C-alpha cells in the first residue's frame, strides 16, 4: 500500500518504512506526527481524493531536524565593475520515517498533526457571533425616521432627553435654543408632529 501526501507545498509518494526529507516541521526528534493531507491511497483498491481523501492520514516518526545541502548564489558584474557577491543558503528540513498509512479513522488516532515551523495548529472554527440588536428603551421612538437624523444625531437627541416624537413636537423656539448637545432643525419639529399623530 502506498499514499501520496502533501506537505510543505510538495507532494510525496510514500510507503511504510520510507525515509523522507520534508520542509521543517514543528516537532522534536522521536515524536510521532500525522500528515492529514493525503491526496491518494494506492493498493488493491485505490482511492483518489477530491482534493484530499477524507479520514486518511500518514503517520511518521521524526528522526531529526537537519539542514539541506548548501546552495551558493554568486553574482558578478563584468568588465570595469569589480563587484562580486556570494550568498549561501541551507534549507531547514525534517527527516521523518513513515510508520503507518491509515486509510480511515485518522481523526480518532490522537496523533499530533504535522505543521510547519511557525504555523499555528488548525483550531476549530468558532461559530460567528450574531450581533445582538440594541434593545430600544421602553416608550421611545425611532428618531432616525426624521429626515437628516442618523444614528449619531439620534444618540445626541437621546442624551438631551428627547426620546419620542411627541417630545420633539412639543419643543418651542426657546427650548430649541436652550439645547446645546445638538442643533435641532425646525423641519424635525414639523416631521415629529406628523409622526406623533401616526
Curated annotation (Swiss-Prot):
Part of the 50S ribosomal subunit. Contacts protein L20. This protein binds to 23S rRNA in the presence of protein L20. This is Large ribosomal subunit protein bL21. It comes from Ruegeria sp. (strain TM1040). GO terms for molecular function: nucleotide binding; rRNA binding; structural constituent of ribosome. GO terms for biological process: translation. InterPro entries: bL21-like (IPR028909), bL21-like_sf (IPR036164), DNA_repair_Rad51/TF_NusA_a-hlx (IPR010995), Ribosomal_bL21 (IPR001787). One of its GO terms (cellular component) is cytoplasm.
Amino acid at each position: 500500500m502506498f499514499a501520496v501526501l502533501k506537505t510543505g507545498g510538495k507532494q510525496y509518494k510514500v510507503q511504510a518504512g520510507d525515509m523522507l526529507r520534508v520542509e521543517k516541521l514543528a516537532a522534536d526528534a522521536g515524536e510521532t506526527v500525522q500528515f492529514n493531507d493525503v491526496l491518494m491511497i494506492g493498493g488493491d483498491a485505490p482511492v483518489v481524493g477530491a482534493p484530499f481523501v477524507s479520514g486518511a492520514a500518514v503517520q511518521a516518526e521524526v528522526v531529526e531536524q537537519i539542514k539541506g545541502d548548501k546552495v551558493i548564489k554568486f553574482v558578478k558584474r563584468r568588465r570595469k565593475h569589480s563587484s562580486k557577491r556570494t550568498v549561501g543558503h541551507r534549507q531547514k528540513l525534517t527527516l521523518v520515517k513513515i510508520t503507518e498509512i491509515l486509510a480511515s479513522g485518522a481523526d480518532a488516532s490522537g496523533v499530533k498533526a504535522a505543521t510547519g515551523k511557525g504555523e499555528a495548529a488548525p483550531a476549530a472554527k468558532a461559530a460567528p457571533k450574531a450581533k445582538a440588536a440594541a434593545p430600544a428603551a421602553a416608550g421611545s421612538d425611532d428618531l432616525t425616521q426624521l429626515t437628516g437624523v442618523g444614528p449619531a444625531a439620534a444618540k445626541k437627541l437621546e442624551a438631551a432627553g428627547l426620546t419620542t416624537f411627541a417630545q420633539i413636537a412639543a419643543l418651542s423656539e426657546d427650548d430649541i435654543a436652550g439645547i446645546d448637545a445638538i442643533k435641532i432643525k425646525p423641519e424635525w419639529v414639523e416631521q415629529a408632529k406628523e409622526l406623533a399623530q401616526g
